[in-house]
Amino acid sequence: MASGQQERSELDRMAREGETVVPGGTGGKTLEAQEHLAEGRSRGGQTRKEQLGEEGYREMGHKGGETRKEQLGEEGYREMGHKGGETRKEQLGEEGYREMGHKGGETRKEQMGEEGYREMGRKGGLSTMNESGGERAAREGIDIDESKFKTKS
């Protein structure tokens, strides 16, 4: 029990030094403030999703991502994503990060179905540093059935 309190004290110290220690708690000056901010932002997001519907909410997020990509440029946007991934890896540890990725892959396979997931992997496997999987497939005449990529309803 004491170790849980020690951990909270350490997180609070880090928050007071300006570090974000709670996902969604950016701007909070203490651990408790960051927890409250994260909770409020989460509730706000849920409310907005209910207002717009699932598809509208997803589209709004997509447009926001595209705007950010235009602001930062392709390279800056990619770098931002890389830094976010590295930060998450530090938070979860190597094993936790790997497990999170594995669970995400399993979830995606369930959403798409085995055949669609395999077809998407085929396309991804064709990619190189200089060419996307789709570009290489087109150049080499490899048929990729992207209709299989659809998420099951």
Curated annotation (Swiss-Prot):
Disulphide bond pairs: none
Up-regulation conditions: By abscisic acid (ABA) and osmotic stress.
Disordered, as annotated region: 1-153
GO cellular component, one term: cytosol
Biological process, per Gene Ontology: response to abscisic acid
Source superkingdom: Eukaryota
Swiss-Prot/TrEMBL Sequence repeat ranges: 43-62, 63-82, 83-102, 103-122
Bias (Basic and acidic residues) ranges: 7-19, 32-122, 133-153
Alphabetical UniProt keywords: Repeat, Stress response
Region described as 4 X 20 AA tandem repeats: 43-122
Keyword Flavoprotein applies: no
Family the entry assigns: Belongs to the small hydrophilic plant seed protein family.
Stated role: Lea proteins are late embryonic proteins abundant in higher plant seed embryos.
Protein name: Late embryogenesis abundant protein B19.4
